[in-house]
């Protein structure tokens, strides 16, 4: 039988597993919200952010004379363990709880309180010498702490995970674009043949999309540096020292290296999460760029004998349980599925962000979960696509030449010399009779052989 201890809150007593640091409110949440427990338990980013939040709050309160130094020191030591990931198993709650994140805020308060009590040699559950509300939550409300943790978590994940992962893929593609900048191939619009481009130009388009999308994410991320801390329950700062918000934000900057600041308008910081909505929208843009790239790659690699086949990609695993020897563009397929998930997450965030009522938005947990999932999926997908696909992209030069030689849209180069109508007649004749453009042009007498050779130069048509 599991050994228990009694914990109390304002609603009474609760039996808690004696090996766990959480208290009565967390235990109630475990019983009241058994929703997606195997899938939607908070991960490292939010738990770490809660630790950073509580550590900085204790330091700020101590400097302002709101907490005894010895109590603050105990809180800081316990919070450091939360930040380091040593207490993750003591954060059992799921995303789907109260929309302000109150249960998760109290989970952090209770865990830090009991661990601090243990460090002091006290009795867990006694709330002495460190009380979860009076000390760990001093000058705070769930309404300002949880959105603060949301922003801290997302900023850290963007900087420590996403930017590097996307940048790695971007750099690989940029190198490929430079490598193949003079390799001329068929361009395509409307899924039909178009005028020539180089393979480098095609890949360079993907690079430019990633550059733009990443710049948009970084711009949106700047808004996440504004924190709700100091607003307490409704944005007025009731029960917090007037300097608490600014000082706490400074402590978060010292802990993380990112320039966090207490938001100028706390009412908006509690009741709306526009910076998170904007960040999600930018992630959606990034996912769209990755979707386009992945689709282009699998189309260009289609075949091997009856598709476009202008590039080859690494053969990573068997592609069929019934067709021997078949190999599929699996990294592209994984990337496109990630993109659709990010699109769905953004729809969740956009709707949830619009649902603030009066002084509070109560969709906070699902918003930050969706954004963090998008960041993680995009990051992992970019690394996988880079390592198992992009680095191995190679041109199939024979197929590229074959397709280019058959491309009727090279006739566009004749427009300025013989006019659109005559050029169109050449293309139609060549297509109808299955001949080359050159043969059709000479047969119609619109150009000489020397003129055709001078005017129809594929590389020159790329303006490379």
From Swiss-Prot:
PROSITE patterns for this protein: FUMARATE_LYASES
UniProt-recorded name of the protein: Fumarate hydratase class II
Subunit structure: Homotetramer.
Compartments where located: Cytoplasm
Pathway: Carbohydrate metabolism; tricarboxylic acid cycle; (S)-malate from fumarate: step 1/1
Gene (name only): fumC
InterPro entries: Fum_hydII, Fumarase/histidase_N, Fumarase_C_C, Fumarate_lyase_CS, Fumarate_lyase_fam, Fumarate_lyase_N, L-Aspartase-like
Residues given in the record as substrate binding sites: 100-102, 131-134, 141-143, 189, 321, 326-328
Biological source species: Deinococcus radiodurans (strain ATCC 13939 / DSM 20539 / JCM 16871 / CCUG 27074 / LMG 4051 / NBRC 15346 / NCIMB 9279 / VKM B-1422 / R1)
GO CC annotations, alphabetized: cytoplasm
GO MF term list: fumarate hydratase activity
């Amino acid at each position: 039988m599991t050994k228990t201890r009694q914990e109390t809150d304002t609603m009474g007593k609760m039996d808690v597993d004696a090996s766990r640091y959480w208290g009565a409110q967390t235990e109630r949440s475990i019983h009241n919200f058994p929703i997606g427990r195997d899938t939607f338990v908070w991960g490292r980013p939010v738990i770490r952010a809660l630790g950073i939040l509580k550590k900085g709050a204790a330091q700020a309160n101590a400097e302002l004379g709101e907490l005894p130094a010895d109590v603050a020191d105990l809180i800081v030591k316990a919070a450091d363990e939360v930040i380091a990931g040593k207490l993750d198993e003591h954060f059992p709650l799921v995303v789907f709880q109260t929309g302000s994140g109150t249960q998760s805020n109290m989970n952090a308060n209770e865990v830090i309180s009991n661990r601090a009590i243990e460090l002091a040699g006290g009795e867990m559950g006694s709330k002495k010498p460190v009380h979860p509300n009076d000390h760990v939550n001093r000058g705070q409300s769930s309404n300002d702490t949880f959105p603060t943790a949301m922003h801290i978590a997302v900023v850290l994940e963007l900087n420590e995970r996403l930017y590097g992962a996307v940048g790695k893929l971007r750099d690989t593609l940029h190198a490929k674009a430079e490598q193949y900048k003079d390799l001329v191939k068929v361009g395509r619009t409307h899924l039909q043949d178009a005028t020539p481009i180089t393979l480098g130009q095609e890949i360079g388009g993907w690079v430019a999309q990633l550059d733009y999308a990443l710049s948009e994410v970084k711009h949106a991320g700047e808004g996440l540096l504004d924190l709700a801390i100091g607003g307490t329950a409704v944005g007025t700062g009731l029960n917090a020292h007037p300097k608490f918000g600014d000082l706490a934000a400074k402590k978060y900057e010292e802990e993380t290296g990112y320039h966090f600041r207490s938001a100028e308008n706390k009412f908006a910081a509690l009741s709306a999460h526009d910076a998170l909505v904007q960040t999600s929208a930018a992630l959606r843009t990034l996912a769209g760029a990755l979707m386009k790239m992945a689709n282009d790659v699998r189309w260009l690699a289609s075949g091997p004998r009856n598709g476009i086949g202008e590039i080859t990609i690494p053969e990573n695993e068997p592609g069929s349980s019934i067709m021997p020897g078949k190999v599929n563009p699996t990294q592209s397929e994984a990337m496109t599925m990630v993109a659709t998930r990010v699109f769905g997450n953004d729809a969740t965030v956009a709707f949830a962000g619009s649902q603030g009522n009066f002084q509070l938005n109560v969709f906070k947990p699902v918003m930050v979960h969706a954004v963090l999932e998008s960041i993680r999926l995009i990051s992992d997908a970019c690394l996988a696509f880079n390592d198992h696909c992009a680095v191995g992209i190679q041109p199939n030069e024979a197929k590229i030449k074959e397709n280019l030689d058959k491309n009727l849209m090279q006739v566009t180069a004749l427009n300025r010399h013989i006019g659109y109508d005559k050029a169109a007649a050449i293309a139609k004749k060549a297509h109808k009779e299955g001949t080359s453009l050159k043969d059709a042009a000479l047969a119609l007498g619109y150009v000489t052989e020397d003129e055709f050779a001078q005017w129809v130069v594929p590389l020159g048509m790329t303006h490379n």
